[in-house]
């Protein structure tokens, strides 16, 4: 047996996504290596096994690999130094540090991952033969740490890591399968980050290059993962057909390789495309599969999103108690997660307000409201035939019941909308501010306006209009694609340009500089008063936003008079 050749074969199998085959081959080599008493080859086996276990989420296997590598390296480090021992200690110390960084990231210990990554960053005098491997390990470790941050919705904290990844890739000159694999992993990871944060134009070339490089090497799993991220981008761009095509191509490969998290994401997007064509029952079946897979993995943030997404089926079916129960389960998951943020709670409250709004519209005779006693197929037909009009009569018991429910919807949606929008003008970059408005605050504010209008609350409508007029946010520019609120419940872009901690917006949030010529003010506005003898507008809802989410919707300054 030519052990070095077999080690190369094992690495090729791992790159191709056949971790089981690679693991079995590596384990079969151990008796031969022990007979030859080659510690350097045994260390390579342990390092490769650790990477396989890391990729498959077998954390105990990663820990054992790290322990055995460190034990062997410690023995050589205590011997008199020579070229062989120096090379061995330097190389496999780094391989162990890489595994430590990846393991800490995988279990959500982001501080530990940062510490391990800093150790791997050691740029002291390097051995020429190890320089390119060291660069590759740094790139790969940063990608793993950044992906783990994004999985915990900590996209803002991942930005410095992604910036270093992009910079290092520009300087990375190595060739061969190892180098190609590093570029593919980084391309898919960074492309997904760009999709998650709404930078679709930047994501596309990264994902296409990663897919092309994976295809050239025959790595079908990497190709499928790139296709899945491209599908997510297509959905964000409102291209339902493109999403369906890419997910359908990616899913069989991802399922064959048993990548549970990506399988769940495939089912999520398949369900979205089904709902986009009005197939409620098919969408619910897809999301049921996604929920099951995320429960198996124990991913609370993903699970909370799929529960919110599944609640739309109950909303369309007019089974509002079921929808409220799903949202309550999602709230419990946020409560149990150390990574939850005020923004997630605000969006959840806004969605709960949507349930109250839908319940109210059913009382008001909305022609597309479902019947909880009918089948989903009958609800699908009702949705297809509906004209979006109300048949109820003013003054009836049903009418007043609906008005009460709309009031409750406003109690949820308006404070959430004000809290979310309070972030927008703390963002100094105009493009980033526009992304936040289009993908985060805009849809939530639209829901608040809709409830105020349907509630026939002219005072609230006028105050919301005044709030927007003071911000100068009405325009006649290009409109975002027309799509239902359901389309982004589980796939909304995640902002990275602002801090989501429950504190007032800090970026340029003080008083305006005197004498400035700009008509646009960053940070919260002072309270707005529409009439001399009235309280500042939206006072009740601003107080709720502060109580629930810790957001200061207005600045601590004298009120502006808007009637002058």
What are these regions (language model features)?
Residues 22, 62-65, 113, 158, ...:
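Single-residue signature of alpha-solenoid repeat helices
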Residues 261, 269-275, 279-281, 287-564:
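Alpha-helical solenoid repeat scaffolds used for protein-protein interaction
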Residues 4, 42-46, 88-91, 95, ...:
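Residue register of alpha-helical TPR repeats
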Residues 17, 37, 57-60, 108, ...:
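Residue-level detector of the short coil/turn that links helix A to helix B
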Residues 27-34, 67-82, 118-130, 163-175, ...:
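Amphipathic alpha-helical segments of tetratricopeptide repeats
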Residues 4-15, 28, 40-58, 91-106, ...:
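Non-membrane alpha-helical segments in proteins
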Residues 13, 33, 46, 53, ...:
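Residue at a conserved register position within TPR or TPR-like alpha-solenoid repeats
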Residues 9, 42, 49, 93, ...:
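Structural register within alpha-helical repeat arrays
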């Amino acid at each position: 047996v030519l052990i070095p050749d077999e080690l190369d074969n094992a690495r090729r199998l791992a790159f191709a996504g056949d971790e089981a085959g690679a693991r079995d081959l590596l384990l079969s080599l151990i008796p031969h290596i022990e007979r030859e008493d080659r510690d350097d080859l045994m260390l390579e086996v342990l390092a490769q096994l650790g990477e396989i276990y890391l990729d498959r989420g077998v954390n105990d296997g990663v820990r054992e690999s790290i322990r055995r590598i460190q034990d062997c390296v410690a023995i050589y480090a205590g011997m008199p130094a020579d070229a062989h021992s120096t090379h061995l200690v330097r190389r496999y110390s780094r391989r162990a540090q890489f595994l430590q960084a990846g393991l800490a990231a995988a279990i959500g210990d982001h501080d530990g991952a940062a510490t391990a990554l800093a150790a791997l960053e050691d740029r002291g005098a390097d051995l020429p033969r190890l320089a390119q491997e060291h660069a590759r390990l740094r790139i790969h470790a940063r990608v793993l740490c950044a992906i783990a941050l994004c999985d915990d919705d900590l996209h803002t904290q991942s930005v410095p890591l992604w910036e270093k990844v992009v910079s290092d890739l520009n300087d990375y000159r190595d060739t061969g399968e190892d180098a190609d694999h590093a570029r593919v992993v980084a391309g898919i990871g960074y492309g997904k980050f760009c999709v998650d944060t709404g930078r679709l134009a930047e994501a596309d070339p990264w994902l296409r290059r990663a897919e092309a490089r994976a295809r050239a090497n025959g790595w079908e799993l990497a190709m499928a993962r790139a296709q899945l991220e491209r599908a997510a981008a297509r959905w964000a761009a409102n291209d339902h057909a493109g999403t369906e095509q890419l997910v359908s191509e990616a899913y069989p490969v991802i399922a064959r390789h048993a990548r549970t998290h990506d399988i769940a994401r495939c089912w999520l997007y398949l369900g979205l495309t089904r709902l986009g064509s009005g197939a409620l029952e098919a969408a619910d079946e897809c999301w049921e599969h996604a929920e099951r897979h995320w429960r198996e993995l124990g991913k609370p943030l993903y699970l909370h999103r799929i529960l919110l997404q599944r609640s739309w089926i109950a909303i369309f079916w007019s089974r509002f108690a079921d929808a409220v129960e799903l949202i309550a389960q999602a709230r419990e998951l946020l409560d149990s997660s150390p990574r939850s943020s005020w923004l997630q709670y605000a969006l959840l409250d806004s969605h709960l307000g949507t349930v109250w709004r839908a319940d109210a519209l059913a009382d008001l005779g909305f022609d597309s409201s479902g019947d909880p006693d009918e089948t989903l197929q009958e609800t699908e037909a009702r949705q297809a035939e509906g004209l979006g009009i109300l048949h109820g009569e003013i003054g009836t018991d049903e009418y007043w019941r609906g008005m009460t429910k709309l009031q409750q919807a406003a109690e949820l949606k308006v404070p959430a909308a004000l809290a979310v929008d309070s972030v927008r003008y703390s963002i100094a970059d105009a493009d980033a501010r526009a992304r936040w408005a289009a993908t985060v605050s805009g849809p939530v504010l639209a829901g608040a306006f809709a409830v105020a209008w349907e509630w026939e609350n002219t005072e609230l409508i006028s105050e919301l209009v005044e709030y927007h007029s003071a911000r100068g946010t009405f325009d006649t520019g290009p409109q975002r694609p027309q799509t239902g609120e359901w389309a982004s419940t589980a796939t909304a872009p995640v902002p990275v340009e602002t801090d989501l901690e429950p504190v007032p917006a800090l970026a340029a949030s003080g008083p305006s500089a005197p004498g400035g010529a700009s008509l646009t003010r960053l940070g919260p506005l002072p309270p707005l008063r529409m009439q001399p003898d009235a309280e500042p507008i939206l006072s009740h809802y601003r107080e709720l936003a502060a109580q629930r989410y810790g957001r200061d919707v207005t600045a601590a300054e004298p009120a502006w008079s808007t009637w002058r």
